[in-house]
């Protein structure tokens, strides 16, 4: 009888151990969903991209959670950014995905990739490492953080803006001088 009880307990514990959810993997439905998000972003398929986010999703790209974007704001930002680029993509073969389940039972997908985009104002191609981490619930992204360094692109853009401002000022001065000479 004692052996039967011990054997039964051992069987229960081994079954329970086998049923624990995997806490780390590089293959999961959530990773597959995030890959679809990346493809939709690259193809500028905003409806497909939006379909993977919960309506109440909070999105933080290089900002604190208190300044989170909504799904609608994310789509508006992507559409505006798309106007400024001839093309963009994440470099093939340079991306890594992983999924982790936290001690609290939260499911997060991490993505590391190399983003490459041809910026219209500078006619220059920028290559920027990027990291995203997205929390999933019920198959949808409910929270997403993204981190990358845009300093090179921004400095180049500011230089173009400063040059344009100088040209505008020179034009205004020339027009004023011409107007004064006519009087």
Give the residues covered by each predicted segment.
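Surface-exposed, charged secondary-structure patches
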Residues: 76-122
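Short, low-complexity N-terminal intrinsically disordered segments enriched in polar/charged residues
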Residues: 18-43, 47, 164-182
